[in-house]
Design a protein with these regions (language model features):
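Alpha-helical transmembrane segments in multi-pass integral membrane proteins
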Residues: 6, 21, 29-47, 61-101, ...
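Residues within membrane-spanning alpha-helices of integral membrane proteins
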Residues: 49, 53-56, 111, 146, ...
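Generic alpha-helical transmembrane segments of integral inner-membrane proteins
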Residues: 57, 146, 150-154, 158, ...
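Membrane-interface helix-loop-helix regions
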Residues: 75-99, 126-137, 141-196, 200, ...
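Hydrophobic alpha-helical transmembrane segments
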Residues: 103-113, 194-201
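Hydrophobic, membrane-inserted alpha-helices
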Residues: 178, 198-205, 221-229, 274-281
Length: 415
């Protein structure tokens, strides 16, 4: 079957959906499925996978820089200071390369982009597509969460080592963490809470966009950006549910919907990609690490990066690209499991302090910790990806295909 494409054009109000002949046939019941938005079902974008791998490594580098050491006054500063200002150029470069918060923002934008395309593949019926989409999200996220929590619990029971307090390992709290109701066993799971909350939002906005076009994406994006300035809405990542980054998913959806037309109208997409990456990298150094405007600007540049990678000139293949794509494939498990190394790295200030006293720069220790942690976690992440994540994906496809015959039969009865 040839992939079905959804073409885009500009209207007076911006980017809007334009039904192709095949989609008109589908709407008339002659075509039962729907292809990707602008990217065919069989066409894969290696650059997006590679960018996801780079983002996962950025988070790991960020966490390694947070390890502390005893200085001459017995204080425990981080190996790499968290502020860009009044620091050495090397520290600033480390923080830019290890911008873990920005990397998570990029994850959210990329999720919005990819899920927009996923929805375009499913049955073109609101009721018919809800089940497969939500089942897919649950089985994409939760199997690896269960596996990771089991590893953390096993390590705690065997050694007593953990990132949190022993109270976090009570039976009720372990269940709550497994369901992503709490995230005090593995703090990085706060972003997965946001992913699950965003799923119904993305689903609703996709169908609103199909009905009303770009205003149904642009208006929620601006509303959510406005809400992000509210402390009650945004919260603190890791301490309760954080909703402040929900607009990042919507920006990813906008990039998916409007990106192809935008890139077609702009020359030199490769140069624009470089500029977008530079803008992403410099947002926090220029506006401040904790500034909400920094996050908003990062989101915009992340949307542009995703757009230029997906719809612009293909990225050059090579060894670095292959390595980045590999980490992109295992990025989810790598992101979850890398926190295991922090149990050790964040609890050895005396050892790091001795190394600093011996003349080793703290930033060098952070880089050594990063390389070591990547070497340790990569095999485990590879196994979890191969065994757990793929099993969840297979189960999701099986359940989806079980639903489809019934959904199609119901559609025939309604027709």
């Amino acid at each position: 079957m040839q992939p079905i494409r959804l073409e885009f054009g500009y209207s007076r109000i911006g980017c809007s959906a334009v039904l192709s002949e095949r989609i008109k046939r589908r709407a008339a019941g002659k075509v039962s499925d729907m292809g990707d938005i602008a990217i065919s079902r069989r066409e894969f974008v290696p650059g997006l996978e590679a960018s996801r791998g780079v983002a996962a490594l950025m988070v790991a580098l960020f966490h390694c820089g947070q390890a502390t050491y005893f200085d001459a006054t017995r204080q425990t500063p981080p190996l790499v200071p968290g502020s860009y200002r009044s620091q050495s150029y090397l520290d600033a470069a480390f923080r830019i390369a290890g911008n873990g918060h920005g990397a998570v923002v990029f994850f959210f934008v990329l999720s919005g982009f990819v899920l927009m395309m996923m929805l375009s593949r499913q049955n073109d019926d609101l009721k018919g597509s809800a089940g497969p989409f939500l089942i897919g999200r649950v089985l994409r996220i939760y199997p690896a969460v269960f596996s990771t929590i089991a590893i953390f619990v096993g390590l705690f029971l065997l050694t007593g080592m953990s990132l949190g307090t022993p109270a976090a390992y009570s039976t009720s709290n372990v269940i709550a963490n497994s369901l992503l109701l709490r995230t005090d066993i593995n703090g990085v799971m706060w972003s997965l809470q946001t992913e699950m909350i965003a799923a119904p939002l993305i689903f609703s906005l996709y169908w609103s966009w199909r009905q009303w076009g770009s205003p149904s994406l642009l208006l929620p994006a601006f509303v959510l950006i406005g809400l992000s300035f509210s402390k009650e809405w945004s919260g603190t990542p890791g301490n309760g549910v954080s909703l402040g980054n929900l607009y990042s998913f919507v920006v990813g959806m906008i990039a998916c919907a409007c990106g192809k037309t935008m890139v077609a109208r702009l020359p030199h997409s490769a140069s624009l990609l470089v500029l977008a990456i530079a803008g992403f990298a410099l947002s926090r150094p220029l506006l401040g690490w904790w500034s909400n405007w920094s996050v908003i600007l990062e989101t915009v540049f992340a949307g542009l990066i995703t757009t230029f990678i997906a719809y612009g000139d293909p990225l050059r293949e090579g060894r670095l690209m292959a390595a980045a794509r590999y980490f992109g494939r295992i990025s989810y498990s790598f992101y979850l499991l890398h926190a295991l190394t922090l149990i050790a790295l964040w609890n050895m200030p005396a050892l790091f302090g001795k190394a600093v006293s011996a003349g080793i720069p703290p930033i060098v220790l952070a880089l050594v910790a990063f390389v070591s942690s990547v070497l340790v976690i990569t095999p485990l992440a590879h196994l979890q990806h191969a065994i757990v994540e793929r099993a969840g994906a297979r189960l999701g496809r099986a359940l989806t295909w079980r639903l489809r015959p019934k959904l199609q039969a119901d559609a025939l009865q309604r027709g």
